[in-house]
UniProtKB/Swiss-Prot annotation:
Protein localization: Cytoplasm; Nucleus
Tissue and organ distribution: Brain, heart, placenta, pancreas and skeletal muscle. Expressed to a lesser extent in lung, liver and kidney.
Family: Belongs to the protein kinase superfamily. CMGC Ser/Thr protein kinase family. MAP kinase subfamily.
UniProtKB keywords: Acetylation, Apoptosis, ATP-binding, Cytoplasm, Kinase, Nucleotide-binding, Nucleus, Phosphoprotein, Serine/threonine-protein kinase, Stress response, Transcription, Transcription regulation, Transferase, Ubl conjugation
Ranges of residues in domain Protein kinase: 24-308
Stated name of the protein: Mitogen-activated protein kinase 14
Modification N-acetylserine, positions: 2
Active site, renumbered: 168 (proton acceptor)
Location of Phosphothreonine modifications: 16, 180, 263
SMART domains in the record: S_TKc
Known cofactor(s): Mg(2+)
Length: 360
């Protein structure tokens, strides 16, 4: 929120009261989830179409309050072309005492990668450009020591020019319930995170990129498991059962015992699975879809892969400023998280306006 308090107006949409600054007009609901509802709006100040998200019960519990603080801190930190950033954050409250609602404003993104894949099988050049942008955004996110954890086609927004932004990063802390059954939430998940094998690292996101890339190349979900076990079987059928070296790294004894009970399977020849694909694409997939996360390619390494020769520019693949997430280990009361969040709202400085965007 800027220092001059704007004039707010109230309106009811889908049984929710929205109280927003006058600059945001023509609010229309576009969706709602567990953590809030989203309206499309027209920003009269910039001429941009924006998404306004009203967080639902942001301070109802310590978990909610910490999540609210986390989301705001993350969005404020992200300043990269391939990562969703914050255009504005506001509250109708005039003081900390009456602070109960948080609204976040981001670019309104038309389609997501799901819509794109459903409509058409993509050319190899499209796949190069889309995956290059995902990796460019991931290099930035990972450099801040943030793990997305939930990369999937519906979390990748794409506009008419095929320009891509990563959404909803670093927030995902999925419940077992949301991961159960025939659900996309799990199809793109690295095995070590899905099955709690071990402490995971940033390359869980690279596994997801491999799954997404395979889907763009073939038009089919790579591992559409019906449950955790079926999912693991589909994965192992392609990449082979773990060898002794990886088994040693799996800290969960039950997971180790289960894997050892399975019939040994060799890794398939990816060229026979992705018939007709660019051999460089197949080579990159083999480096991403590696069971041992220590041996998986990183985002920075993948950007330098020959598959992206026409897009790779080492001078234009920026890293993030350091991101202080020491708050993650803090145990605070609701009012303390709320006060920290209020400070973040008040201190927000809007990004400089991008001329190109305003003209488009």
């Amino acid at each position: 929120m800027s220092q001059e308090r704007p004039t707010f107006y109230r309106q009811e949409l889908n049984k929710t009261i929205w109280e927003v600054p006058e600059r945001y007009q023509n609010l229309s609901p576009v969706g709602s989830g567990a953590y809030g509802s989203v309206c499309a709006a027209f920003d009269t100040k910039t001429g941009l179409r924006v998404a306004v998200k009203k967080l639902s019960r942001p301070f109802q519990s310590i978990i909610h309050a910490k999540r609210t603080y986390r989301e705001l801190r993350l969005l404020k930190h992200m300043k990269h072309e391939n990562v969703i950033g914050l255009l504005d954050v506001f509250t109708p409250a005039r003081s900390l005492e009456e602070f109960n609602d948080v609204y976040l404003v981001t670019h309104l993104m038309g389609a997501d990668l799901n819509n794109i894949v459903k409509c058409q099988k993509l050319t190899d050049d499209h796949v190069q450009f889309l995956i290059y942008q995902i990796l460019r955004g991931l290099k930035y996110i990972h450099s801040a020591d943030i793990i997305h954890r939930d990369l999937k086609p519906s979390n990748l927004a794409v506009n008419e020019d095929c320009e891509l932004k990563i959404l909803d990063f670093g927030l995902a802390r999925h419940t077992d319930d949301e991961m159960t059954g025939y659900v996309a939430t799990r199809w793109y998940r690295a095995p070590e995170i899905m099955l709690n094998w071990m402490h995971y690292n940033q390359t869980v996101d690279i596994w997801s990129v491999g799954c997404i890339m395979a889907e763009l190349l073939t038009g089919r979900t790579l591992f559409p498991g019906t449950d955790h076990i079926d999912q693991l079987k589909l994965i192992l059928r392609l990449v082979g059962t773990p060898g002794a070296e990886l088994l040693k790294k799996i800290s969960s004894e039950s997971a180790r015992n289960y894997i050892q009970s399975l019939t040994q399977m060799p890794k398939m020849n990816f060229a026979n699975v992705f018939i007709g694909a660019n051999p460089l694409a197949v080579d990159l997939l083999e480096k991403m879809l590696v069971l041992d996360s220590d041996k998986r390619i990183t985002a920075a390494q993948a950007l330098a892969h020959a598959y992206f020769a026409q897009y790779h520019d080492p001078d234009d693949e920026p890293v993030a400023d350091p991101y202080d997430q020491s708050f993650e280990s803090r145990d605070l009361l609701i009012d303390e998280w709320k006060s920290l969040t209020y400070d973040e709202v008040i201190s927000f400085v809007p990004p400089p306006l991008d001329q190109e965007e305003m003209e488009s």
